[in-house]
């Protein structure tokens, strides 16, 4: 965090130096799916050497998750990029980025908007991979999570709709919001995220969207065992890790 002098913000460990939350998912049939496109996307794309994109999934309309859309031009200039969002996010796109979606300005990225409806059981495919939108709540704001094949991706969340939570059963890997150790009005705490991990029991889970209040990356797993061993079995705690920038994760399908 700018101006902060805490041990995390001044850490030299690259695991503690995080840009805004996003993910690039490569499927077995070589489709590259981007989840969210925040204002750090250009730098993230250069670091990761992203050559192509086949689809964009958007969780919600907050600045840190979508204000990099204009930087998609190199990946969506010649070939339109399918873009998936819920009704609320779609309305924001048509209003805030009307020069992309309504009155196309010359040279803008060609984003083809598809509005999905979790309440109607919408499921769609990107290549051979099935994607299921999951209704979540960021405080009071309805947002989307996604099941992408055997991967669950849930960010900025305080609740997963009871109708949709079972749709995540059977996943191999879970990436889930866990802002800090103490509770927050619009994000899961570590203990709250662990409740979801315990319900789903994936092979591996990664906490994302952490603030500097989470503490040093190197201390996380020890602290997790110390603070939550009376609430959750150690075998479950051992499957949980902090995500970090440029991390590559193998998902077993």
Place the predicted regions along the sequence by residue.
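Binuclear metal-ion centers of metallo-dependent hydrolases, dominated by the metallo-beta-lactamase
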Residues: 161-253
């Amino acid at each position: 965090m700018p101006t902060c002098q805490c041990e995390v913000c001044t850490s030299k460990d690259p695991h503690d130096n995080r840009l805004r939350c996003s993910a690039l998912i490569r499927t077995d049939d070589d489709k590259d799916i981007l989840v969210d496109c925040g204002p750090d996307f250009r730098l993230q794309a250069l670091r990761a050497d992203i050559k192509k994109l086949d689809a964009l999934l958007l969780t919600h309309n907050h600045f840190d998750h979508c204000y990099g859309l204009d930087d998609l031009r190199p990946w969506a200039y010649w070939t339109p990029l399918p873009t998936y969002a819920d009704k609320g996010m779609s309305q924001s796109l048509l209003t805030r980025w009307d020069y992309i979606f309504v009155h196309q300005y010359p040279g803008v990225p060609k984003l083809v908007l598809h509005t999905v409806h979790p309440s109607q059981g919408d499921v769609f495919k990107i290549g051979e991979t099935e994607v299921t939108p999951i209704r979540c709540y960021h405080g009071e704001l309805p947002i989307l999570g996604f099941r992408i094949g055997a991967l669950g991706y849930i960010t900025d969340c305080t609740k997963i709709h009871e109708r949709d939570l079972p749709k995540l059963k059977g996943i191999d890997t879970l990436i889930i919001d866990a802002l800090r150790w103490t509770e927050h009005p619009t994000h899961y705490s570590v203990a709250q995220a662990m409740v979801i991990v315990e319900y789903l029991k994936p092979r591996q889970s990664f906490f994302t969207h952490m603030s500097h209040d989470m503490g040093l990356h190197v201390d996380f797993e020890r602290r997790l065992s110390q603070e939550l061993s009376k609430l959750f079995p150690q075998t479950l705690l051992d499957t949980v890790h902090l995500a970090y920038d440029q991390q590559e994760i193998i998902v077993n399908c």
